[in-house]
C-alpha cells in the first residue's frame, strides 16, 4: 500500500511539473467538428492521404458518440493478438438513450477470438450514473510467457493458450466533467490453459512444458473479482489526445473460489499528461504507472494474473509480456510533431521494471525509439513504432494510440494481465 501511495504521488508530480511547463497563453477552445478542420503540419499533406483518412473516418467513426446499427468492431484486443483484428458489431439505444445494448465479435491476425454482449443504463441520476452488465468470452491462442522475474531470459520465450468466460456488473458515477468513481464485480469461470494454436504460429515451446512449476500452471479455479477506482480525465480526445491529463487509482481483489491458493489483492496508480508546446503541432506526453500485488499466507498470484511489462505500450524495445512479477513500475516520455495534417512523427523513451518485492523496484530496463501516427482530429487510426532495448530492435504496428490506456475500461478483459 505504501508503494501504491508513492506511485500515486509520482503521478500527481508528473501532472504538476507538466502543467508548469505548459505555455502561459490560454489554449484555444476545444474543436467540436470532425477531421475536416486543419490541424496544421510541417509539410503540405498529399490530397490522396487526406481523402483516405476521411473515407476511413466515415466508415469507422471518430471517437464520437456511438450510432445505432451495425458497425465494424476493429482493434482493441490484447498485446500479441497481431497487428489487426476485426469483426461485426451491433448496438442500439432505446427510450431516448436511457437503455443501451451492444454486441460484437472479433478475430485477430493470430486467431485470437472475442465475443461480448452488453446491457447498460447510461443516463441515471441526471446523466451522472451509468450501470451495466456484460458477458464476455475470449480465446487467446498464442500468449507469450518468459517466466517470472526481471532476470528471466529471452531464450525462455514460450507460448500458451487461454480461454475463459467472464460475467460482470459495473457502475460509474461522474461527479463532474472530469472526475468519476466506479466499481465492478464479476465471476471469472475457471480459465482454461492449453497448447498454442491458430495461424502464424512462430514455433516457440509451450509454456505448460517449459514452466510447469510456476503458480497457476496446474489447476485453474473460478475467481470472484471486484475493484473500485477513482479517475480524473481532462484529455481533449480519448483516441488522439493532444492536451489534458488522465489520472487513475484502482484497488481490487481476486478471490479463489475452489483451491484456496490464488487469492490476492492488486493496487494500481497511473498518470498521463499531455503538454502542448506549440499548439497541437508539437506535444509532449508523459506516462507513469505502478502495479502492486498482495497475498495472504499460503496464497500466490497465478502467472496469468501477474503484472507484465514489455511490448507496444510499455517497453517498446522488448517483446510483449517480456517481464512478469508481482509488482511493476514504469515511466515513459514521448515528443510528437505534426508532419502532415493527419500524420505525426514521434520519438520516445521508456523505462521500468518488475520485482517480487516493492522495495526492489527500479527503472533499469529502458528502451527508446521513434514512430509515426496516422490519425483524425479525435482518433488514432494506426501507428508504427520502432524501439530498441538491450535485446535488440522491435517493430510494432497497431490501430490505437500508445496512450490509449485500454486497462482503464471497466468492460475490458480481466485475464491475462495485458500492459
Regions inferred by a protein language model and the residue ranges of each:
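Outer-membrane beta-barrel initiation region
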Residues: 21-132, 193, 208-242, 310-312, ...
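Transmembrane beta-barrel strands of outer-membrane/channel proteins
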Residues: 74-76, 103-107, 131-141, 146-149, ...
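Outer-membrane beta-barrel transmembrane strands
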Residues: 86-88, 92, 150-189, 218-226, ...
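Residues on the lipid-exposed face of transmembrane beta-strands in outer-membrane beta-barrel proteins
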Residues: 88-92, 117-121, 167-173, 185, ...
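Extracellular loop and loop/strand-boundary signature of outer-membrane beta-barrel proteins
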Residues: 104-105, 152-157, 211-217, 253-259, ...
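Outer-membrane beta-barrel translocator domains and adjoining extracellular loop/strand segments
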Residues: 114-119, 143-151, 193-202, 241-243, ...
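Outer-membrane beta-barrel translocator/channel fold
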Residues: 129-170, 290-309, 382-405, 412-419
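Extracytoplasmic gating/loop element in the C-terminal half of outer-membrane beta-barrel translocons
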Residues: 276-351, 356
Amino acid at each position: 500500500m505504501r508503494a501504491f501511495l508513492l506511485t500515486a504521488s509520482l503521478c500527481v508530480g508528473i501532472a504538476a511539473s507538466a502543467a508548469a511547463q505548459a505555455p502561459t497563453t490560454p489554449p484555444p477552445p476545444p474543436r467540436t467538428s470532425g477531421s475536416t478542420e486543419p490541424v496544421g503540419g510541417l509539410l503540405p499533406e498529399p490530397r490522396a492521404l487526406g481523402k483516405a483518412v476521411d473515407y476511413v473516418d466515415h466508415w469507422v467513426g471518430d471517437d464520437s458518440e456511438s450510432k445505432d446499427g451495425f458497425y465494424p468492431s476493429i482493434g482493441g484486443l490484447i498485446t500479441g493478438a497481431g497487428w489487426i483484428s476485426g469483426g461485426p458489431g451491433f448496438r442500439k439505444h432505446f427510450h431516448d438513450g436511457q437503455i443501451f445494448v451492444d454486441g460484437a465479435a472479433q478475430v485477430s491476425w493470430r486467431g485470437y477470438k472475442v465475443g461480448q454482449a452488453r446491457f447498460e443504463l447510461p443516463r441515471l441520476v441526471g446523466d451522472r450514473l451509468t450501470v451495466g452488465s456484460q458477458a464476455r468470452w475470449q480465446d487467446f491462442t498464442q500468449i507469450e510467457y518468459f517466466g517470472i522475474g526481471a532476470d528471466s531470459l529471452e531464450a525462455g520465450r514460450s507460448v500458451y493458450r487461454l480461454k475463459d468466460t467472464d460475467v460482470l456488473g459495473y457502475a460509474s458515477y461522474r461527479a463532474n466533467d472530469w472526475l468519476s468513481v466506479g466499481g465492478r464485480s464479476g465471476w471469472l469461470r475457471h480459465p482454461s490453459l492449453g497448447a498454442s494454436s491458430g495461424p502464424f504460429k512462430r514455433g516457440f515451446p509451450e509454456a505448460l512444458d517449459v514452466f510447469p512449476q510456476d503458480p497457476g500452471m496446474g489447476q485453474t479455479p473460478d475467481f470472484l473479482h471486484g475493484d473500485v477506482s477513482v479517475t480524473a480525465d481532462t484529455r481533449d480526445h480519448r483516441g488522439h489526445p493532444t492536451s489534458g491529463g488522465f489520472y487513475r487509482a484502482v484497488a481490487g481483489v481476486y478471490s479463489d473460489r475452489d483451491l484456496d491458493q490464488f487469492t490476492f489483492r492488486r493496487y494500481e496508480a497511473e498518470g498521463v499528461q499531455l503538454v502542448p508546446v506549440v499548439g497541437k503541432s508539437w506535444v509532449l506526453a508523459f506516462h507513469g504507472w505502478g502495479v502492486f500485488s498482495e497475498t495472504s499466507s499460503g496464497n500466490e498470484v497465478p502467472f496469468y494474473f501477474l503484472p507484465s511489462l514489455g511490448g507496444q505500450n510499455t517497453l517498446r524495445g522488448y517483446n510483449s509480456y517480456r517481464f512478469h512479477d508481482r509488482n511493476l513500475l514504469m515511466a515513459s516520455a514521448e515528443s510528437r510533431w505534426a508532419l502532415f495534417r493527419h500524420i505525426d512523427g514521434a520519438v520516445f523513451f521508456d523505462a521500468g521494471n518488475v520485482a517480487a518485492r516493492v522495495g526492489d523496484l527500479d527503472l533499469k530496463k529502458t528502451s527508446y525509439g521513434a514512430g509515426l501516427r496516422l490519425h483524425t482530429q479525435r482518433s488514432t487510426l494506426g501507428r508504427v513504432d520502432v524501439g530498441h532495448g538491450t535485446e535488440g530492435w522491435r517493430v510494432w504496428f497497431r490501430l490505437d494510440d500508445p496512450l490509449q490506456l485500454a486497462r482503464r475500461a471497466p468492460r475490458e478483459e480481466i485475464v491475462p494481465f495485458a500492459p
